[in-house]
Design a protein with these regions (language model features):
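Hydrophobic alpha-helical segments in the permease module
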Residues: 63-71, 75, 168-175, 241-255, ...
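Cytosolic ends of transmembrane helices, especially the final helix of ABC transmembrane type-1 domains
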Residues: 212-215, 239, 287-314
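Transmembrane helices of ABC transporter permease
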Residues: 15, 19-32, 70, 134-188, ...
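Juxtamembrane loop-to-helix connectors within ABC transporter transmembrane domains
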Residues: 4-5, 13, 82, 100-147, ...
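Short intracellular "coupling" helices and adjacent cytoplasmic loop segments at the cytosolic face
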Residues: 87, 95-119, 123-125, 198-222, ...
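ABC-type nucleotide-binding domain
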Residues: 330-576
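An intracellular "coupling" helix at the cytosolic face of ABC transporter transmembrane type-1 domains
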Residues: 106-107, 123-132, 136, 140, ...
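Membrane-integrated ABC transporters
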Residues: 1-37, 49-63, 78-86, 93, ...
Length: 576
């Protein structure tokens, strides 16, 4: 594990210091109790069995049983403390990862696919959870038994122990060699699982498209192929673990055969008692079992290291968003775009905006129209600071928007988009999403103003009606009116309407348009739209084409320019 990753993991474990210290104490006590029974067996053979002292047999066995009881109690406490601490460590790690993902700039999500991020939150954290909560505890226990066993073996017979140490270098080299391979294959396995998660997430979220094109079989095959890649990595990882376990077990139990030969010879030559040989063999079995268990745990530990590297790759990434600045409490004068150029970070070779300049006076409703891909929606993204301009400036009351605290800037902006996204909760909580401390009355008033109250109360559970994933249980018009109610409750100074009525039928559009008029009152509004009903009353209209402003003026001014784009757009709408 890289030192920085280990340092971050230890830092996350710091609040569990007390539990981990007690867990370590119980680990030492349980391992110590487990290491006493070979001594007791030796004493029983040399002082009870061989001298045939029947009166001492039951008390000796009783003491042996007591040692096992003590080991069991301390072992249980050790497991409880280590496992619970590990669960809490990974819980904090998962929360930090989620918080870090949400803190990233919007451009980050253009580059990272949702399935990959979900895989790191779910699969990688689960692997790491198993490593931190169970494997480390078991690994420390086995390591303690191995080291303690070696110590008592030296105490029993230094000659036998010295000969046994010949086996240590090959096992250590094997652990290093196979550990490197296991870590590599584990990371490949996690990455291929992430790819499978991406495919599944894309397919399920776009299920209607999949079914409409009858692509269920093709998507199943695509998912199956990504799983095959993970199976190949899993096979390689499992083979490496199996090879290492084989090496460890052969070395461990091969040493038992060696001890039986050499130790038996020492007993015959009277250099070692039968009790000493039995004690040595029992310690050797403890060491062999410990080494074998460490072999299987080693693979899991390497998988955990691979998962932790993927988790900390996100945790160590600093967001490019500048969040600090002065508070934006009100807008007094204007919003100004000055020679703004912009390219999306994932398409730096294509310039979406090419020197855009305009000014919006506070309280005005300004519309932006133009062909698809002309950069209309991008203006709203830049004003909300989802992205930063490549060059040029965006000002509010003469100050760059980057000088304002990001939170306070976005608190002053309300967005109603073409396809509003609702959270999978109740209608009430979706409206209250704008302001968590809003009262029920404020929520209901916002719904009335958005022409949403009547359809909401007609549901059997009213405002407690669950909307489903992304609001799938509601119609397009209903979702839009809930989104408008949410924006009304937020009470922003700046409003961005991004094609807010383009997907609605005539009846729904009328209700939504009426609600939008209430929403726009006394607010500075940027309207991105095609429909004439939305833009004809705007104070000013800007026509965008290929990233530049080709026309500007009121509807009456622009409609008279019959050879220009605006006139053509309006005529095309009437034709349809």
């Amino acid at each position: 594990m890289k030192s920085k990753t280990l340092q971050r993991l230890l830092q996350t474990a710091k609040p569990e210091k007390t539990s981990l210290i007690w867990g370590f104490i119980f680990l030492v006590l349980s391992s110590g109790a487990g290491l006493t029974y070979p001594q007791l067996v030796r004493w029983m053979i040399d002082n009870v069995v061989q001298p045939k002292k029947l009166d001492l047999l039951l008390p000796t066995v009783g003491v042996l049983f007591l040692a096992f009881v003590i080991q069991g109690i301390f072992g249980s406490l050790r497991y409880y403390l280590f496992t619970l601490s590990g669960e809490r460590i990974v819980l904090r790690l998962r929360k930090k990862l989620y918080e870090k993902i949400l803190s990233q700039e919007v451009a980050f999500f253009d580059q990272w696919r949702t399935g990959d991020l979900m895989s790191r939150l779910a699969s990688d954290c689960a692997t790491l959870q198993n490593t931190v909560s169970v494997n480390i505890s078991q690994g420390l226990r086995n390591l303690g038994q191995v080291l303690g066993g070696f110590g008592f073996m030296f105490y029993t017979s230094w000659r036998l122990s010295t000969l046994m140490f010949v086996l240590v270098p090959p096992i250590a080299l094997g652990a290093f060699y196979f550990g490197k391979k296991i870590r590599k294959f584990s990371k490949q396995f996690q990455e291929s699982l992430a790819e499978a998660s991406i495919v599944a997430e894309e397919t399920i979220s776009g299920l209607r498209t999949v079914k409409s094109f009858v692509q269920e079989s093709a998507e199943t095959d695509r998912y199956g192929k990504t799983l095959e890649f993970s199976l190949i990595a899993a096979k390689s990882r499992t083979k490496s673990i199996a090879d290492f376990m084989t090496l460890a077990l052969i070395a461990g139990f091969g040493s038992v055969c060696f001890v039986l030969w050499y130790g038996g010879r020492e007993v015959i030559l009277s250099n070692l008692s039968m009790g000493d040989l039995t004690q040595f063999l029992l310690y050797l079995m403890i060491v062999a079992i410990g080494v074998g268990s460490l072999g299987s745990l080693w693979g899991d530990m390497m998988a955990g290291i691979g998962a932790s590297q993927r988790v900390f790759e996100i945790l160590e990434r600093e967001s490019l968003e500048k969040t600090e600045g002065i508070a934006l409490k009100e807008i007094l004068r204007s919003i100004d775009f000055k020679d703004v150029h912009f390219s999306y970070p994932t398409r730096t070779d294509y310039e979406v905006l090419k020197g855009i300049s305009f000014s919006i006076v506070v309280g005005e409703a300004v519309a932006f129209v133009g062909p698809s891909g002309s950069g209309k929606t991008t203006l709203g993204y830049l004003l909300s600071r989802f992205y930063e301009p490549t060059s040029g400036e965006i000002l509010i009351d003469g100050k760059k928007i980057s000088d304002y605290a990001l939170k306070s800037l976005r608190e002053q902006i309300g967005i109603v988009s073409q396809e509003p996204i609702l959270i999978s909760d109740t209608i009430e909580e979706n409206i209250r999403y704008a302001r968590r401390d809003a009262t029920d009355k404020e929520v209901h008033d916002a719904a009335r103003a958005a022409n949403a109250y009547d359809f909401i109360v007609n549901f059997p559970t009213g405002f407690k009606t669950r909307v489903g994933e992304k609001g799938i249980q509601l119609s397009g018009g209903q979702k839009q009116r809930v989104a408008i109610a949410r924006a009304l409750l937020k009470d922003p100074k700046i409003l961005i309407l991004d094609e807010a009525t383009s997907n609605l039928d005539t009846a729904s559009e009328h209700l939504v348009q009426e609600a939008l008029q209430r929403l726009m009152k006394d607010r500075t509004t940027l309207i991105i739209a095609h429909r004439l009903a939305t833009i004809k009353d705007a104070n000013k209209i800007f026509v965008l084409n290929q990233g530049i402003i080709s026309q500007q003026g009121t509807h009456d001014d622009l409609i008279r320019q019959t050879d220009q784009i605006y006139y053509q757009l309006v005529q095309r709408q009437f034709e349809t």
